[in-house]
């Protein structure tokens, strides 16, 4: 059995785990779920479905580049990008929760030298991204979340 077959079979369980993570993160205002032992730091990304228009939340590993937050749209090395990536492409202005802080952000895809620099930064946060890159033929997007003025 290859990796993708195993991941496909376990996807319903993974969705329940992610929903539980999100619920605990929100219920504790980030006290539990933001930074846990042996895990990379996690934020909650709010996004609107590109097709459905439904509001969704995804717990995602993140890194920091100055004031910006950085995400990797790896989906574990699947052949397709994660749904949240398509949703951000359609609706780039959104909100994230980092610990107890809620931040209005604008999403964009990093390219060229910036992408390579941020990829290296994120591999430092979570080394598994290199394994994911080897599993897929697609270029895994690096997403930059730039803070937006509030008000």
Describe every region a protein language model picked out:
Residues 1-35:
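Extreme N-terminal tail/first-helix region
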Residues 40-74:
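Short beta-strand segments
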Residues 65-67, 101, 150:
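Short strand-connecting beta-turns/loops that link adjacent beta-strands
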Residues 75-129, 135-139, 147:
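Short, structured beta-strand-loop surface elements
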């Amino acid at each position: 059995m290859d990796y993708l077959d195993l991941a496909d079979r376990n996807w319903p369980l993974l969705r329940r785990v992610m929903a539980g993570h999100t619920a605990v993160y929100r219920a504790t205002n980030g006290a539990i779920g933001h930074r846990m032992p042996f895990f990379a730091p996690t934020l909650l990304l709010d996004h609107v479905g590109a097709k459905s228009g439904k509001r969704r939340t995804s717990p995602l590993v993140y890194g920091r580049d100055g004031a910006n937050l950085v995400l990797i749209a790896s989906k574990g090395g699947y052949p397709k990008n994660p749904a949240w990536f398509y949703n951000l492409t359609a609706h780039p202005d959104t909100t994230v929760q980092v610990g107890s802080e809620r931040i209005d952000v604008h999403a964009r895809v990093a390219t060229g030298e910036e992408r390579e620099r941020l990829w290296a930064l994120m591999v430092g946060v979570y080394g598994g991204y290199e394994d994911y890159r080897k599993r897929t033929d697609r270029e895994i997007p690096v997403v930059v979340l730039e803070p937006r003025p509030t008000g």
